[in-house]
Amino acid sequence: MNMSKAEAFWQLTRMNRPIGSLLLLWPTLWALFLAADGLPDWHVLIVFVLGVVFMRSAGCVINDFADRKVDGHVKRTANRPLPSGLISSKEALSFFAVLVVCSFLLVLTMNTLTIMLSSIGIVLAIAYPFMKRVTYLPQFVLGLAFSWAIPMAYAAESNQVPSEAWLLFVINALWTIAYDTQYAMVDRDDDVKIGIKSTAILFGRYDKTIIGLLQLSVLALLIVLGSQLALSGIYYWGILAAAGFFVYQQWLIKGREREACFKAFLNNNYVGGLIFIAISASVLYQS
């Protein structure tokens, strides 16, 4: 089936697959609702939601640009707009620049601290795709990139980045490494052949164990966060439910089948949503 130019750009941003935007949105909302005691400023909320959409789209574009010479050798990615020739490298870079500018125009309506922090976020978004060629730990860089909205959210709401923001940052970074390792398990065999590095390759036969340890660390630190902020019992019920989803994910990846690993990755959307409900319900109940 022939694809129009507009459809190709839409696919390039993965707007047809919103899971990445959701996984970036949930921790942003965690931070906004915690920083604002459950009632974030509407202007700030809209800016951050739109910023998530623009920056996630920009991240997908620069990722496909970085992978344009190898995606054609992977069955799952061979039909993407860049390797298939529907979009040129120059067009992709121009589109990336437009998305970044749109994001920056949004953040310019925030305070100075938020604007300063945003520059680091842009660097992380650009760096991640290229890390897959130089280190087996690109998921760590993605963890930083997908967590950077957290200190930005606190800065936007309170003009400071307290210790709880950095604890939440670590929690989300560990969670990101866990679920992106699940995602990397899907393409592990292809990645080995074409020289792409990932934690799935680095961890090898210990992949499931390390993912489990990361998930346990996330749960433990969420409990620490709840204790520090004196969150209500509603919050802990949410953490218990999230633990149940982590157990389910471990069951899914036990045989390392591609489809099951991808299903485990997708399941993390429910984890992020549950934690958001737990946080927002708890802080609203207490306010």
From Swiss-Prot:
Principal localization reads: membrane
State which residue ranges cross the membrane. Answer: 19-39, 42-62, 95-115, 136-156, 166-186, 210-230, 233-253, 264-284
**InterPro entries in alphabetical order:** HB_polyprenyltransferase-like, Prenyltransferase, UbiA_prenyltransferase, UbiA_sf
UniProt entry keywords in alphabetical sequence: Cell inner membrane, Cell membrane, Magnesium, Membrane, Transferase, Transmembrane, Transmembrane helix, Ubiquinone biosynthesis
* Function in brief: Catalyzes the prenylation of para-hydroxybenzoate (PHB) with an all-trans polyprenyl group. Mediates the second step in the final reaction sequence of ubiquinone-8 (UQ-8) biosynthesis, which is the condensation of the polyisoprenoid side chain with PHB, generating the first membrane-bound Q intermediate 3-octaprenyl-4-hydroxybenzoate.
**Pathway membership:** Cofactor biosynthesis; ubiquinone biosynthesis
Catalysed reaction(s)? all-trans-octaprenyl diphosphate + 4-hydroxybenzoate = 4-hydroxy-3-(all-trans-octaprenyl)benzoate + diphosphate
GO terms in the biological process aspect are: ubiquinone biosynthetic process
Q: Which organism is it from?
A: Aliivibrio fischeri (strain MJ11) (Vibrio fischeri)
What does UniProt give as GO cellular component? plasma membrane
**One GO MF term:** 4-hydroxybenzoate polyprenyltransferase activity
Q: Where in the cell is it found?
A: Cell inner membrane
Enzyme Commission numbers on file: 2.5.1.39
Q: Which domain of life is it from?
A: Bacteria
Q: What is this protein called?
A: 4-hydroxybenzoate octaprenyltransferase
Lineage of the organism: Bacteria, Pseudomonadati, Pseudomonadota, Gammaproteobacteria, Vibrionales
Q: Which Pfam families match?
A: UbiA (PF01040)
The gene from which this protein is expressed is ubiA
